[in-house]
Amino acid sequence: MRLDLFKEQVAEAGKPLQPTGERSYFGLSGFHTCQRNLYYKAKGTPRKPIESRVYRIFQQGHDIEDQTIGLLKQVPNILIEEVDPETGRQFEVQFYGGHIKGHFDFRCRSEYYFGETTRKLGEIKSANDKNFKMYEKKGVQQTNETYYAQVQCYMHGTQNNEHWKDHALTQCLFIVFNKNTAELYIEMIDYNKAEAEHYLECFKNALQAPELPEKYSDNPTFYICRFCDFAEYCHKDKSIELEKIKQCKHIQPNMTSGNWFCTKTDCEFYKQQVGGLTEKCQSISQ
């Protein structure tokens, strides 16, 4: 009997059969309170390979989202839209020429429950029982600023936008699914222009910063640093291999076209992708 081998194989199961590839944009779901964390993400800094266990957690989140959408569709007197009727794809907002993008879960409308016919943005998250109780006690903004920033930027992306026209979204129906008890926490979050612009400014600074920002903390055991994907670069001074154009400290975004350009040499995007960076360029860790 090879039960131990079977356990090992099961533990490693769950990764996609095909690599999903790196996003060509910075997702709004990647907001972080540390500006250096945002900088590393914006520059495409390599992270640790994702474990199979983590992939399974991601898949569980997708399953919970589907389950919750199914529940919402069973509720009378409310319209649930999962895709943009104009594109046939998931609802999307973007900023700075497409360098920053976000996709939200659904859009809904119900005069019966919400007292008006205007559409609401919808976002679904899941949490363990401990964190779920925090949402109940303190609300989304104080419990998870990343999620709060995410939906504020989503709503901001629908304002004064030709694609959205008369359908700008100024409220978000935020739903948290308790993974332990299957309870639901529901909160209506109002759009706040000033806060959304603040969060987007953080993203913009990360894209355009010519130098590595200061650390959030010099203490590697500080909770924000301890669980950071880039702790090994920040606190252990691991060098960054110059594999992609965005990992060069001289690269800057074109905030209109969504492309990148080099501020130090005349190197071109495809040449850097194929042949590697020139010797004149430096790692963002230097």
Q: What are the roles of these predicted feature ranges?
A:
Residues 1-121, 128-130, 286:
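Metal-dependent nuclease catalytic cores that hydrolyze phosphodiester bonds in DNA/RNA
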Residues 124-141:
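Short beta-strand-loop-alpha-helix junction that forms the active-site gateway
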Residues 134, 141-144, 148, 153, ...:
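Metal-dependent nuclease catalytic regions and adjoining charged, substrate-binding loops involved
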Residues 31, 41-42, 125, 177, ...:
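Structured loops at beta-to-helix junctions and adjacent beta-edge loops in soluble globular domains
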Residues 121-128, 176-180:
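A short mid-domain helix/strand-loop element embedded in enzyme catalytic domains
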